[in-house]
Amino acid sequence: MILANTVWEAWDKTLETKDFTHLEKYLSADFQVEDTTGEVDNLENTKSWCVAGGLRINNFKTIRETKNYIVATHDVIQEGKPNSSVLVYAEQTNGKFTYWKIQRAFEA
């Protein structure tokens, strides 16, 4: 089981350094991330936006954590966009995250 704080730290370190190896070890080869609009990206597309820069996450709060999923919130700071908050639901199987769903709300 990957703890929520472990994956948050890896994701933030990836965004900070633009080095996907920090996060990649926690994601399955068939990893999918679904955004607020319902658009689904694969592992390669996730890597692309993670290493592009201009995005940071912070203020992590775990709501629920089990061996199969986590539910949490965090804030996002992204160049050219208002600050936002994200609700995350993420599933893991066999020690890797396979699915990540976000609901993102921007400040007015």
Question: What does each model-found stretch correspond to?
Answer:
Residues 1-25, 29:
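Short, low-complexity N-terminal intrinsically disordered segments enriched in polar/charged residues
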Residues 9, 34, 40-108:
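A beta-strand edge to alpha-helix "cap/lid" segment located at domain peripheries
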Residues 16, 39-40:
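A structural signal for short, well-ordered beta-strand elements
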Residues 27-30, 35-37:
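Generic secondary-structure microfeatures
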